Amino acid sequence: MTAICAPPRGCEPDDVIELRSGGARCSLWWGATPSHAGRRTGFIGAIEAEDDDALPAVLSRATDRLRAQGCALAVGPVDGDTWHRYRLVTSSDGTPPFALEPYTDAVASAPWLRAGFAPLETYASYRDDALAARDPRVPALEARLRGAGVTLRVLDLERFDAELEQIHALALRGFRDAPLYAPIGFEAFAALYRPLAPLLDPRLCPVAERDGRIAGVLFALRDPHAPETVVLKTVVRDTDRRLAGLGFVLTDRARAAAHALGATRAISALQHDGSVARSLAADAVVFRRYAVLAKELQ
């Protein structure tokens, strides 16, 4: 269960705060964290507590430490960077956790709110139970992209590391404008995705190429605990404006493949509210919301 539902922890922290009372501890990062709206951030993550009542106290200690380091904004939970585990669930309709979801109880945000934190960035996961439907706009989009030199294929698991090298470079370009983004080295990136290889079905992972390199990719997998569900985990495309609509096409390909394989539900996971992809199916509905929280320090 852990291997498919718990994303790995992040990089080594700059400090660790620990309270003996309540068994609470957290890790802090500030040395290489990205700014947010021009303000220097410090991250709080890897939080553990035997008693939830101890969390406000350890968060208070953490914010004092980040303030002393010159941070203007304490942000959490973030385990080092947004390539690793981050976010809290803030609301849910009761749908069970899905594969690779950073799931928490919806009440987990309460200690943060009591400590003076508020939502900084918000996200949602969407449920799509109409996989048989194909958007009529897709053929025209595919034709335009073919005219721009784009070809489509499936992920090559026989050359997975070679695929990951190109996907890493693509992700650095495609995600660079995402909130709280910081670049990550190839080995750290590959360490996140290599363990997924046994779970991936290439038919669910469309890849777009142009000029001999990967220009877009979608990672999706069958949920081992709900085989009728396919989780659309990550979609990224090159930022070239001529590739507008490619994310939509990749998502449509994955949905069609899921339907052909007998799946009845697709989950578009952890979409940022400020940039929800237009590739979301028209019938998709929100079933879970998440947030990264922050507290002003200066």
Regions found by a protein language model. Give the residues of each.
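Conserved GNAT-fold acetyl-CoA-binding loop/helix
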Residues: 1-7, 176-192
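Short regulatory alpha-helical segment in sensory/regulatory domains of signaling proteins that mediates
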Residues: 66, 172, 197-198
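Conserved donor-binding loop and adjoining core beta-sheet/short helix segment
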Residues: 8-101, 209-235, 239, 297-298
